[in-house]
Amino acid sequence: MKLVEKDAEKKMKNVGASSTAEATPIVLVVDDNKAVLEFLLLLLSKNGLAGIGASSGSECLAIVRSRQVDLIILDVMMPVMDGLKACEELKKMCPSTPIILLTARDDMMTRAAAMDLGVSEFVAKPVNNRDLMSRIQVQLRNLEWGKAADQVVSQIDRSTSHPKK
């Protein structure tokens, strides 16, 4: 049991520490405005994160079906499938993936609908770069902590389970 506890302590201490062996987090950015999309992808890149762009809710869903992403930044006001509808579908597909909702529509009804859907953060446009990057880092750190905690629990479960006789 001591080995498990030491390993658990080590994993929890390493959470948040960058390592070349760890994969770069992948952030999916969804915005129908090409200039905003390109700007956000550049901001992510300058901060050491990998970004994938999508210009619609349906394109976002197709990407999430084909690959894993660590975080989604989603615009609310988009044609065909708005960000709230896309968020509803995303929460069915990948419920533990954090979603940051980005919008020029900062009203209480939109905010309430977003929170009801389980959005992690709600950011109003125009975006403050530092604020957005801070929120992204917090969500990625929380995700990393959650994964580390799951690994520790799994390891403890394996070490304490006994074969049935």
Question: What are the functions of these language-model segments?
Answer:
Residues 1-26, 140-165:
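Non-catalytic signal-transmission and effector/linker regions of two-component phosphorelay proteins
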Residues 38-46:
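Charged docking surfaces used in two-component/phosphorelay signaling
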Residues 55-59, 82-86:
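Acidic catalytic/metal-coordinating carboxylates
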Residues 67-73:
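Active-site beta3 strand of CheY-like receiver
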Residues 78:
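Receiver (REC) domain active-site loop signature in two-component systems and cognate sites
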Residues 85, 106-121:
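Alpha4 helix (beta4-alpha4-beta5 surface) of REC/receiver domains from two-component response regulators
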Residues 109, 127-136, 144:
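C-terminal output helix
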